[in-house]
């Protein structure tokens, strides 16, 4: 690591092996559990993740209750094999109705230190222009929810990468019935379905067997330089 006055940075040679090691894990060792310290670190990476206009339109449900996990099995086919073996399971929620003029967005503005009424008004005007004119997010409730859902994937990636850096395996999960997942977790009292909706899930633990090498397209096929 290279020390600076502010923090410690790492070299590509130190980081790339963790990216190469990280593969979607579908077979966890049930006898190995992630320590509280290590999992709090993973959650902190999620909390510190960036989001559009600093909105932080997410919540992280850590599903450890065995009975609740069993209730997910009939419709969570993407993680049915790991519900009993994953050390930790996180379901990430996205905010509903995060309009530029909603109390949720206004709270975010104030949290970032913008409290002057005139400054708040100018910020809201920028948000309105972005949501209404630039990205057309106000076309429907779904487009606005999907915008918040996109932000959760930033946190998701940071959690998985940060886990890999300390030798913890993971697997992102979209393979479930969203209506049933929302209903089951809401009925368990995990969230208000009028305010939040399930975006994506992720499992964490330690692999119980070797995982086949990942297949990736060559850089020349996915990167275009505009010079």
Predicted regions and their residues:
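Acidic, surface-exposed loops and disordered segments
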Residues: 3-227
């Amino acid at each position: 690591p290279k020390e600076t006055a502010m923090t410690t940075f790492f070299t590509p040679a130190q980081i790339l092996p963790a990216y190469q090691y990280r593969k979607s894990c579908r077979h966890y060792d049930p006898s190995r559990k992630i320590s509280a310290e290590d999992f709090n670190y993973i959650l902190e990476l999620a909390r510190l993740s960036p989001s559009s206009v600093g909105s932080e339109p997410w919540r992280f449900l850590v599903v450890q209750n065995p009975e609740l996990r069993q209730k997910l099995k009939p419709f969570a086919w993407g993680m049915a094999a790991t519900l009993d073996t994953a050390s930790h399971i996180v379901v990430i929620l996205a905010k509903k109705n995060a309009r530029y003029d909603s109390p949720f967005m206004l709270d975010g503005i104030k949290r970032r230190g913008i409290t002057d009424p005139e400054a708040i008004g100018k910020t809201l005007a920028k948000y309105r222009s972005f949501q209404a004119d630039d990205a057309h997010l106000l076309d429907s409730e779904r487009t606005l929810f999907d915008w918040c859902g996109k932000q959760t994937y930033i946190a998701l990636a940071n959690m998985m990468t940060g886990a890999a850096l300390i030798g913890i395996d993971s697997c992102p999960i979209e393979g479930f019935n969203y209506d049933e997942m929302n209903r089951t977790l809401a009925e368990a009292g995990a969230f208000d379905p009028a305010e939040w909706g399930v975006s994506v899930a992720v499992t964490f633990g330690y692999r119980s067997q070797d995982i086949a090498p990942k297949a990736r397209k060559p850089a020349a096929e996915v990167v275009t330089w505009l010079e």
